[in-house]
Amino acid sequence: MKVTLIAILTCAAVLVLHTTAAEELEESQLMEVGMPDTELAAVDEERLFECSVSCEIEKEGNKDCKKKKRKGGWKCKFNMCVKV
């Protein structure tokens, strides 16, 4: 009986400590208003970026978008990057 009671109390104590540690970690990872740019840069490094490509017609009318060509056609370049 005593062993079961000790096991239950130990398990409850571990659960409380784990929950408290998880809440503290979550609070430390939240961004605050007025956060310096250096801290924001660290947050941005962890995020992935998706970049879209825009194409502009240089000389030859309505051709499909191709990679950079040296003579006429379409010229493609990165347009913008979006955080995911």
Curated annotation (Swiss-Prot):
It is found in: Secreted. One of its GO terms (cellular component) is host cell postsynaptic membrane. Expressed by the venom gland. GO terms for molecular function: toxin activity. Disulfide bonds join C51-C65, C55-C76. Keywords: Disulfide bond, Neurotoxin, Postsynaptic neurotoxin, Secreted, Signal, Toxin. Residues 1-22 form the signal peptide. Residues 23-47 form a propeptide. Postsynaptic neurotoxin. Belongs to the neurotoxin 12 (Hwtx-2) family. 02 (Hwtx-2) subfamily. This is U4-theraphotoxin-Hhn1aa.
